[in-house]
Amino acid sequence: MAAPIKFPFRPRGGQPREDTTPKRGLRRYLLELKESNKEFWLSGHAVFKLLSLGCMISALDYFETMLPHPVLILLICMEAAICIFFIFLNTLAINRYIPFVFWPMADIFNSLFSCVFLGGGIYFAFKARRLLPKPYLTAMILMGAAAICSFIDMLLQFQHFRGLRLRKW
């Protein structure tokens, strides 16, 4: 086997650079946080999740001025809490540390069920009252806007599956 070539001069290109990313600790987590949530904020998921959350909170505020059925309050609070969970999950990059859950599929199902529950809540709110005062009607419209934002967010989630190939067993 031949000995490696020794150059009398320094070859062009210099030494290969070492990987400067931190291997552990807070600096590594902050770097991963910066890199991992760019897609969430720039692809439109965050905008529609925040719009949906804002509509749900506004609808809850309008419902609180009246005396609605307690199921409507419970429904909106539950959907808002789940929406906040997914916003924190994607913003803090926690989904990288829990690999046994396929998070894009969980987010699609969350958006689908949120759309269905909010639509059912609108139907229930409409059937629960004969007279629809202005704050009650406004809250129903805001619930509809939140359902539409959840549906659009569900459609945006399908981008995760474009390049995905199924395994053949």
Curated annotation (Swiss-Prot):
Membrane spanning residue stretches: 40-60, 69-89, 98-118, 136-156
GO molecular function terms listed in the Swiss-Prot or TrEMBL record: cytokine activity; transcription corepressor activity
UniProt superkingdom: Eukaryota
InterPro entries (UniProt xref): Marvel
GO CC term (a single one): cytoplasm
Keywords: Chemotaxis, Cytokine, Membrane, Transmembrane, Transmembrane helix
Subcellular location(s) of the protein: Membrane
Domain MARVEL: 40-162
Presence of the UniProt keyword Transmembrane in the record: yes
GO biological process, one term: regulation of testosterone biosynthetic process
Membrane topology: Multi-pass membrane protein
Recorded family membership: Belongs to the chemokine-like factor family.
Protein name, UniProt field: CKLF-like MARVEL transmembrane domain-containing protein 2A
Organism: Mus musculus
